[in-house]
């Protein structure tokens, strides 16, 4: 995949999917950078896994999601979060037809989005890839989500050489593993950090 354009010559349609405040905080600078770059057409899809704090991050960065799945329901189980996210992201992929899907971290929303993209044969880019504790149950379910996401990822963007090395020890193709730190600092006065 190149960053020049799609096969039709237009900008790359990159779907960024998140559902929690930490994901939003980490992906918001990427969303705004892509919106300022004519090579990209970012599509923001929010699952709403953690509804209450997403809006303040969106307001801070001036982001209006293209699609809000609004899956949050009091007392929902991990199975319900996964099911609602998988179905909702699947519908969003069919509607927007992205060239790639970006997920961040280890949430259930990230796992479901990666799986939906894989099912639609859309490349997955995983930001903050390769983090491992060595115990699939700790933290739960995040460690399992990390490992599952890595199985369907086309490009692993690792925050450290240690996380890169974790993926290489798991026999991940070195050609799809990059050490990549987000190239932007925390904005001054950012109260949402």
PLM regions with names:
Residues 9, 37-39, 63-64, 119, ...:
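Short, well-ordered coil/turn elements that cap or connect secondary structure elements
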Residues 38-84, 88:
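Conserved nucleotide-sugar phosphate-binding/catalytic loop shared by glycosyltransferases and other
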Residues 10-11, 60, 186, 190:
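Intrinsically disordered, low-complexity regions
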Residues 13-18, 24-30, 57, 71-174:
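Active-site and donor-binding regions of nucleotide-sugar-utilizing enzymes
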Residues 47, 51-52, 152-193:
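A nucleotide-sugar donor-handling region in carbohydrate enzymes
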Residues 65-68, 124, 176-179:
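Conserved beta-strand scaffold positions in the cores of enzyme catalytic domains, especially
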